[in-house]
């Protein structure tokens, strides 16, 4: 598995400003966590998405950082403990 964080410098509240990815050996996302400026963490697992290149996903405005498994698991665990989606707006 490969682990990445993509970070964008924008103020849009309805777009994630951080994206944490777990990619399998083919480059397909298996788990991801979207982080929004309002403090909402949106974990997604059991993904069925095509292979992706984190640098392409970041575009010209994003920064890509390689993570290790422990770092990704820490973020994943945090995201599972926090309210998400609509309920996250109230915390």
Describe each region flagged by the PLM.
Residues 55-91:
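Short, compact, well-ordered microdomains
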Residues 12-40:
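Short, flexible N-terminal segments of the mature chain
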Residues 16, 25, 44, 49, ...:
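Amphipathic alpha-helical interaction segments
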Residues 4, 19-21, 70:
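Exposed, low-complexity/repetitive linear segments and helix-based recognition motifs
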């Amino acid at each position: 598995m490969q682990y990445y964080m993509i970070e964008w410098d924008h103020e849009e509240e309805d777009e994630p400003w951080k994206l944490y990815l777990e990619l399998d050996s083919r480059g397909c996302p298996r788990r991801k966590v979207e982080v929004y400026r309002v403090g909402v963490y949106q974990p997604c697992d059991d993904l069925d998405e095509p292979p992706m290149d984190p640098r392409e996903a970041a575009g010209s405005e994003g920064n890509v950082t390689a993570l290790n498994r422990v770092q990704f698991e820490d973020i994943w665990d945090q995201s599972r403990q926090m309210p998400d989606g609509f309920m996250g707006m109230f915390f």
